[in-house]
Amino acid sequence: MLTSNKISSLVIDTLRKQTGEQNIAVIFLYCDYQAQKDQSAVNMIGSLVRQATLREPTILSEIKRAFDKSKREGGDGLQLPDMVKLFGKVSSYMEVVYLCVDAVDEMLPQHRLEFLRALQQILQDAPNVRLFLTGRPYIRAELDKYLTEKTYAMHIIADQGDITRYLRQKMDDNDDQDPGLMTEDLKNNIMATMAEKASEM
């Protein structure tokens, strides 16, 4: 069964293989509901800047100057508009930049909206940036609001048969390690509950 992060990982791996040594960057973020407080828009865009800079180290001095200037002016660091501009500068050194963002729905709503606005600005300012984003269907209206131009949405829904086979395999593996731990009724109950929950996602 492919989960959101496995789909993103496949996309990232495929892009990396296809781009090889070309002047193309593949950079990514995995959002996690357990780290929501750390996933502010400025931190997320900052992570993209960091990853892009690793691909294009010649711009390091310019980024350092921007950080130093921000500190001298009494700031705590670069703000979101500054990070967005920096990302645009870094990405201009590359032919194409692929941004892969997994599980954007797991960000806190206020951070997610700021992040989507920042991505919107990046896509407007940097025509060489391509975005691959995953999230649950309930954020579709937000995506439509901020990322409407030139977007293609694909709904991937878990197949009940795949879920059943995956769960059965995991429970059989568990039986091999600890036989008799689960009764057949418990297994069937787990499978029914998980299949129902998956269909609600």
Protein language model features and the residues they cover:
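Conserved NB-ARC/NACHT P-loop NTPase core of NLR-like innate immune receptors
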Residues: 1-201
